[in-house]
């Protein structure tokens, strides 16, 4: 009996202890539930929401680039792509292995993806593959459960309707490099492209726009259930150029037979660039996904350098096109008058050196107008000797040669108008012989085709015309395209008149050096000047043999052919330059091209037709 009572007491104590523990546990849980649901309810609700809502930035549509009449030069089309969000998979390598069995990835693609995953925060999507086909997307979706972290998305990619025809002007975009992302972390977004050349680079920030964001509901595996909210961001600004795409096509068609050439057409009145061609060219869309090493090697090995914009970065001796600058320098210095004459026997002796005229028998006695019309080398040897290199250089700069122009394109070169001071700085003792050959555009002088067109426009108008390519930015007419009087060059009307008369005679008068440039439409007359720039020295033996023919030399040893012009002669509207590399003679190779292009410009008359801004609409295209 006593033993039974003792057992009952032990049981009762154990029950009480157990019951007390249970009460304590339930009490603790109750307190915790109160803390979670009441005291900290708002905080935990937010955490729960973040666990099921994924916010992702989206790249904004890049702004369009248009010609002056609204023709699309650079636009956008849809681009379906596969992205990887590293934070949504525990095994990035395993996910990529599975993806590669569905859509094959090359080793260099895997390496790039790995670098980008390491470089960026894990919630930032990384591009796995762009330009997916319908079959690719279907296969990815079917295998979605085995592809944690993979998301099929749609963005945009750049398209260039005129491809090679405007590649050097419009430029191209490419994926941002590490330096780009370091400057702007927002460029890490998949599908973002940055301007790397041409107008795409000049106006890159305006064309980029502002990134948007999308809120997505996702499941535990990170798969999208539905879209909750979307901010499209702000599309890039629209850029309207001064270019007339129709005139550009006409110009390129005229250059089709030349291996390497360039040409520029300007509106004399405001400096608008209406056409700018550089041949050979390239397809700018190849840069969208990054150029392959094989393609880059092909371009690098091509002696014609297709990536070079010859119009702004090709430098050439101007040859006889320099003679208007020499003439104006002589007239403005009052050392030479329009009526002063020089006798040309076909050569010019300076000490022991003999400098030859292009015309073997000489031109006889010529005044300044006749010197320009006949492009007499001896006349300009003597004129250069009398005025000196510094006056020639100063006038060249004044007319836009060998100096920086305000063109809105990256990579423009300044060329060179040498002076005595420049020669001394180079360790070269400037000689009178250097000055003499400079008088016919040989020696150290270097100019670009854009400078030559600007030079022609300045001679035509007597004003400091500056070339430019941007007509409207975000719908606003740019200052350079607004009707305005460019600063006067402060050249005498008499000097300009005699030089212009000489240029008119070159084209329109019997005996001029460019009869092939005469316009067939009698409503207009063109004034111009031929030029041929040697790329190698002609020896005395070759010259004296009488059998030397530069047209029979290998292509790369032939002289460059140049021509500059403006029209109409009596009321200048358009100026141009044509440079045919190794074309041998400006009169034969460049002048006929200039004639046809100028005629087309006058007939189209783009500078007299106003443009009308158009609404921005992204061009769309289905997957391939």
Residue ranges and their predicted role:
Residues 60, 76-81, 275-281:
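Short beta->alpha transition motifs characteristic of CBS
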Residues 33-55:
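Aromatic-capped interface at the extracytoplasmic side
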Residues 1-10, 23-24:
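Secretory targeting signals
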Residues 2-5, 218-230, 268-321, 325-580, ...:
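Beta-lactam-recognizing serine transpeptidase/beta-lactamase-like catalytic domain environment
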Residues 84, 88, 94-104, 112-236, ...:
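Small/polar-residue-rich segments within soluble enzyme cores
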